[in-house]
Amino acid sequence: MFFESFGKSEHSVLNDFSQPSVLWGIDGDWMVNFIGKDQLFCPTDHCGVIRVLNENEVLSRYLVYPLQKEGEKQRFSRANRASTERIRSLIIQVPSIEVQKEVVEKLSKIDEEISKAKQYVANASSAKQAILDKYLK
């Protein structure tokens, strides 16, 4: 579920990175992402940022999943933008902190497996291209 960063910036509109952040895209396909604490990033006018006030009640990493699902239900897209007002109006039910931790742990393991599988496919594609280049050029 987590996305690779793109682009580099020497500054950010944020100056406090001591808390984790949940980001969502305003334009295009509906996407939600988690940025860990102390990880620098620069939000643009094409995304929104949520900072959980109390991680003892709601885990930021957990919030990514129900926010993703709710955005899909709302059919957020380029035509139906996920403005801060629309995000603010969402009602998301969250289970106990123990259940949130369990969900995060299980899904993090699966996300890691997906990441490894994507890397395997990328490596295989590169190996295939190298063979094609060697014998067909």
Name each region found by the language model.
Residues 2-68, 72, 83-87:
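A short beta-sheet element
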Residues 16, 38-40, 66, 79, ...:
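Generic preference for flexible, low-structure residues
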Residues 72-73, 113:
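A general structural signal for well-ordered secondary-structure junctions
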Residues 74-78:
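A short linear hydrophobic-aromatic micro-motif
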Residues 93-137:
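Amphipathic alpha-helical coiled-coil/heptad-repeat segments
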